[in-house]
Amino acid sequence: MPSHYYLIIPASGVGVRMHPEKDGLNEQPKQYLKLDNGLTILDQTLKTLLSINQIKSCVIAIKNKDHLFAKSAFNNHPKLLTIVTGGKERMYSVLNALKALIDFAKDDDWVLVHDSVRPCVKASEIINLMKQLKHHATGGLLATKVVDTIKQADNNIINTTIDRSNLWQAQTPQMYRFSVLLKALNTAIKDGINITDETSAIEHLGLESILVKSSKSNIKVTNPEDLILANFYLNQHQK
């Protein structure tokens, strides 16, 4: 029986860097900011990913007392399996979403975890990720090669220049077998490992991840200027 593909969107962040003057606490979460096309960042993200035929269903993790997702155009989407409460950190949000899939996903089914604030990801690149990893035992992620010169510094004083020839910038989706990702996150939490993405948890287990080249346009909207760039890329995608 072929493996199914499930989508997890952790969307419980508050966006401190988007609203530094308010410490991100009293401003609208960045995933609900509007793009030039009239959609919120989250809705644009969902529009792209839920349009992919291979994706069977989706679990979204939102902040406790989040009343904004109820207004989403995708709140009643047929592929939306359930909504879970996000955790204090990303890994807990993803783990809560994985637990919601336990009664649905098989061990070797795929789970794609995608940042809610990466609205410019192309469906074609996600489909290529699925194709490249189809027969892999663990999984992998979209990424781009680092092209800038990278400096390591201490208190703004440069210590060294890092060889960039083998450096990649991790993006999302990050796609792993259901049972592997569930074990990886549980193990990382048990061991007290602070992870910032799913691949970090896989690395902690000592497992292999595959990098699949993506485009620079798959940006994460973190700062105000990123919103301008996201609108530019989305406009270019329509041409």
From Swiss-Prot:
Write the gene name.
Answer: ispD
Query: What is the protein name given in its UniProt record?
Result: 2-C-methyl-D-erythritol 4-phosphate cytidylyltransferase
Look up and give the organism this protein is from: Ruthia magnifica subsp. Calyptogena magnifica
Q: What family does this belong to?
A: Belongs to the IspD/TarI cytidylyltransferase family. IspD subfamily.
Q: What does this protein do?
A: Catalyzes the formation of 4-diphosphocytidyl-2-C-methyl-D-erythritol from CTP and 2-C-methyl-D-erythritol 4-phosphate (MEP).
Q: Which reaction does it catalyse?
A: 2-C-methyl-D-erythritol 4-phosphate + CTP + H(+) = 4-CDP-2-C-methyl-D-erythritol + diphosphate
Record-linked NCBIfam families: ispD (TIGR00453)
* Organism placement in taxonomy: Bacteria, Pseudomonadati, Pseudomonadota, Gammaproteobacteria, Candidatus Pseudothioglobaceae
- The protein's site described by Positions MEP for the nucleophilic attack is found at R164, K220
Q: Where is this site: Transition state stabilizer?
A: R17, K30
